[in-house]
């Protein structure tokens, strides 16, 4: 859909008319974050055990949204790449809380593993990477949790 939006003028007009509120201004003439978001989720689900994949996806879904919301609205202390300390703290809090809530389901992960994964996800969100963070956050945080789980004996 995203590629068609960019290549087919009639479709682009339709999307602009009905869905413009969902597309950021800086994404009007390029791929939106949806493609790397779906790829990141798919790679994460394919690569890691269910609990770790679910936590990593929640870190992206909850943490990234809170970082953007809080950072844009209340971000005063700039740290890396124009990101704010307030947004980063919001990311960590949202990611950890989503992990805690995940533990209320049938999926049970050690809180220390969730905290480590949330911190890795927040650091990845701060880095000026050439790839979209929607792709990188769940893959890297999931990989970190998988590595920690395997080296500590949690599986």
Identify the residue ranges that each predicted region occupies.
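Interhelical loop and helix-boundary elements at the membrane-water interface
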Residues: 2-102, 109-151
């Amino acid at each position: 859909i995203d590629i068609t939006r960019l290549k087919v003028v009639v479709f682009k007009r339709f999307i602009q008319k009905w869905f413009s509120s969902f597309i950021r201004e800086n994404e009007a003439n390029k791929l939106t974050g949806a493609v790397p978001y779906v790829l990141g989720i798919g790679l994460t689900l394919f690569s890691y055990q269910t609990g770790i994949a679910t936590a990593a996806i929640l870190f992206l879904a909850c943490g990234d949204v809170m970082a953007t919301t809080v950072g844009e609205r209340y971000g005063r202390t700039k740290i890396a790449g124009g990101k704010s300390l307030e947004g980063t703290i919001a990311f960590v809090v949202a990611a950890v809380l989503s992990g805690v809530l995940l533990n209320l389901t049938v999926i049970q992960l050690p809180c220390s593993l969730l905290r480590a994964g949330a911190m890795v996800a927040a650091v990845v969100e701060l880095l000026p990477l050439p790839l979209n963070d929607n792709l990188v956050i769940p893959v890297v945080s999931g990989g970190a949790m998988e590595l920690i789980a395997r080296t500590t004996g949690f599986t």
